[in-house]
Amino acid sequence: MDWESFYDPATGYTLKKITNEEYIRSPLFEPLCLGVKFEGEQEYAVTQEDLPRFFNMMRKHQNKIVVIHHHAQFDALINSYHFDFRPKLILCTLSMARALNFPRDMSLSLDSLSKFYNILPKTVPYGLFQGKRWKDMDSYLKKLMLDGAARDALNADEICDRLLPLFPREELISIDWTIRAYSEPQLIGYTQEFEEIAKNEEKRKADLLKSLGLTKDLLTSNAKFAEILDALGVEVEMKANAKGQLIPAVAKSDSFMKDLLNSEDETVKLLAETRLAVKSSIRETRAGRMASMSERGPMTVYYYFCGAQNTTRHSGGDKMNWQNLERKGPMRKALLAPKHMKLIVVDKSQIECRILNAASGQNDVVERFRAGEDIYCYNASMLYGFPVNKKDHPTERGTGKQIELSCGYGCGAPKFVSTAALGIYGPAVNLELMEAMTAVKLYRDTHSEVVAQWKQGDIILDEWNKIGHAGTDFTLMGVKYKDGYAILPSGLRLDYTTTTYDNKLRQYFFHHKKSFARNVSSGIPEGEAERWEWWYRKGYRTLYGAKMVEQLTQALSAVDYRQSCNRVYLKYGLRPAMSSHDEAVFVVD
């Protein structure tokens, strides 16, 4: 099934300007026609006049119907919101394609996949019907649209035929509940609370600026911010931009900026915090968007299935990332169950850590988990030399937690110091570099099997560099890597066929995502800084043994998580209303 609907770029009523949810729930929305292809039958299109009759028939049999869409969130929300149609199973060829290792730079649109499989291309005349209602179209334009919609439905069906033999059956269930979190939403948003969050965030930023006696433009300008730091006696680090020019290293991701956030000088620390706060409008924008959504209906939770490259985890979409809502933050608290129903929050406790140690063969740590021992207190006791418990030693236990959770992927002492200062794993701690080195060494000495997997990852990379990916067969953490692909328990694969080695930088890279910069030179620059920038702009990221272990652990955790959700869905009919990497929120009676 494939929908065609009214849109009007002249007034901003277009998916380029607003979210899918706002577009579909808008009073301006008008379904024009629906392309349909039943199995074993000729494709056709349902006219606007025939849509009510068509869906009356479909609803009578919806418990037996499997529907195929390309970008199912869009089409399935139209089905449910406007026509109360909820089939037995929803398949999405876009979600399937995203999981099946197509080239990173290839578009996965219906038209692009049609061309890839040598299927006739799309013919919908979008340029001819923009701004036109069904009643305003002549018979010729209507025929063009109906033929194009029918062709799109046929193409989605043929693409599905090609993808299904490659796709794990269990993951089809995962796609279904991922789509329904958006197309059949369950959570209710507390509108007033979202509006209050947005107002409070604006006030917080204004108060920060007032406390410093500065204006927003002074902090958002890199040059002016650097001048303020210089006046305070802070030596500003510089970095090369894409053109090779030196600029202040004051981006959020720069290590110098992270040092400022951890500065012992409270004024410098406040300056850095305020700069990041006023440069970002994410919090109030998100709260405002959620407030608007809650006024239109239940909260449509959008996830890209396998959106996170080389981990197969979900990622955010439709201008919202539901994955990174603070678990104890005000926005989460403003998400409610429908009247007379309840929310159940289920968490796969320490899943990454458990899988990392179990798959690596670090059996002593696994046994401590099995015995119910607090592994974080155990680490802290080893580090500090006295018995640590959760009640009396929260700071020390936090460091023990950081040892277990951050050192498993090759974390070094400098990063350990900066992470401790952020208070991610417990109360913020200012560690000396030597203390961090001791903590890192403790992990590596007590997790020799995990460290061995890092080394195995390095060996695999070196072998790929020597002989290529084709014909290779390796094992990492019990998972087979054949021909450059890691084959997960579900049957999905992680793609490492793009790994390459830069001899000058002595660094491996892999194609992580689409190139975000146009006109990047085809040849690699000579200068070291320029080479790093070139790889980054081409969509590549660094890769090393411990990073491969991290990606594989997260991928295995994602598979385990989806399998658990599938079991609950199939046995009890409950699907996640919202989920994160290791947590699911269910709505129950």
Spans of features found by a protein language model:
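Metal-dependent catalytic core segments for phosphate chemistry
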Residues: T19, L28-E30, V345, E352-F386, ...
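Conserved "right-hand" nucleotidyltransferase catalytic core of DNA-directed polymerases
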Residues: M1-E4, D8-Y13, I18, S26-C33, ...
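Active-site-proximal helix-loop-helix substrate-binding element of RNase H-like nuclease domains
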Residues: F29-F55, R59-L164, I175, C377-G385, ...
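Short active-site loop/helix that positions an aromatic residue
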Residues: Q73-D84, A97-N101, F225-G233, S349-N363, ...
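Short beta-strand-to-loop capping motifs
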Residues: F586-D589
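Function-dense linear segments that define catalytic or interfacial modules
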Residues: F305-N389
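Active-site palm subdomain of RNA-directed nucleic acid polymerases
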Residues: L163-I175, D560-A584
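Conserved pre-motif C helix in the palm subdomain of viral-like polymerases
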Residues: R151-D157, S349, G545-N566
